[in-house]
């Protein structure tokens, strides 16, 4: 599941990465931002 999410998040990784403080709420997708935090 993480692998698939990571691949899909890679395209929109710039957005959550820019706001690592609160990617959950700032990002359009809660799971996408969360995955970025966990993977990072």
Swiss-Prot record:
GO terms for cellular component: plasma membrane. Residues 1-40 are annotated as: Disordered. A lipid is attached at residue 37 (S-farnesyl cysteine). Residues 1-22 have a biased composition (Polar residues). The keyword Lipoprotein applies. It holds the Pfam family Mfa1. The modification Cysteine methyl ester is found at residue 37. GO terms for molecular function: pheromone activity. It is a lipid-anchor. Residues 38-40 form a propeptide. Keywords: Cell membrane, Lipoprotein, Membrane, Methylation, Pheromone, Prenylation. Signal peptide: none annotated. It comes from the Eukaryota. InterPro entries: MFA1. The keyword Oxidoreductase does not apply. Its main location: membrane. It is found in: Cell membrane. Mating pheromone for A1 allele. This is A1-specific pheromone. It comes from Mycosarcoma maydis. The lineage of its organism: Eukaryota, Fungi, Dikarya, Basidiomycota, Ustilaginomycotina. The gene is MFA1.
